[in-house]
Amino acid sequence: DQDCLPGWSFYEGNCYKAFDEPKSWVDAEKFCQKQSNGKHLASIEGLGKANFVAKLVSEDQSETLREPQIHVWIGLRDQSERQQCSSHWTDGSAVSYECGLAYPFIC
């Protein structure tokens, strides 16, 4: 079904959109949930979807999302007691961001 709201992009059964208003991880997730049909921050499974999301960010017309090495929130999160979003890549290296920092995000 390709019935996405205006401004959203369809990929493999879901609709996605980049938002350039910086929010914390929690606030970005809440924002996404308020969108049509209780959406969430984007989950990225596989290279195809990773490339699609990267293209969404690179094609966005806002100044914020065109900055070099911009961080964006996605649905990856494993919260520790210190309020950090952390997980691990397949090579074992850590991925860690302060969840309270405000970044653009992808629903």
Curated annotation (Swiss-Prot):
Location in or out of the cell: Secreted
Q: Which Pfam families match?
A: Lectin_C
In what residue span(s) does the C-type lectin domain sit? Answer: 11-107
Q: Which UniProt keywords apply?
A: Disulfide bond, Secreted, Toxin
PROSITE patterns the UniProt entry points to? C_TYPE_LECTIN_2 (PS50041)
| GO CC terms | extracellular region
Q: Which cysteines are joined by disulfide bonds?
A: 4-15, 32-107
Give expression by tissue: Expressed by the venom gland.
Q: Molecular function (GO) terms listed?
A: toxin activity
Describe the task this protein carries out. Inhibits integrin alpha-2/beta-1- (ITGA2/ITGB1) dependent melanoma metastasis.
* Record-linked PANTHER family: MANNOSE, PHOSPHOLIPASE, LECTIN RECEPTOR RELATED
Q: How does it assemble?
A: Heterodimer of subunits alpha and beta; disulfide-linked.
Give the protein family.
Answer: Belongs to the snaclec family.
User: What is the designated name of this protein?
Assistant: Snaclec VP12 subunit A
Taxonomy-wise, where does this protein's organism fall, top ranks first? Eukaryota, Metazoa, Chordata, Craniata, Vertebrata
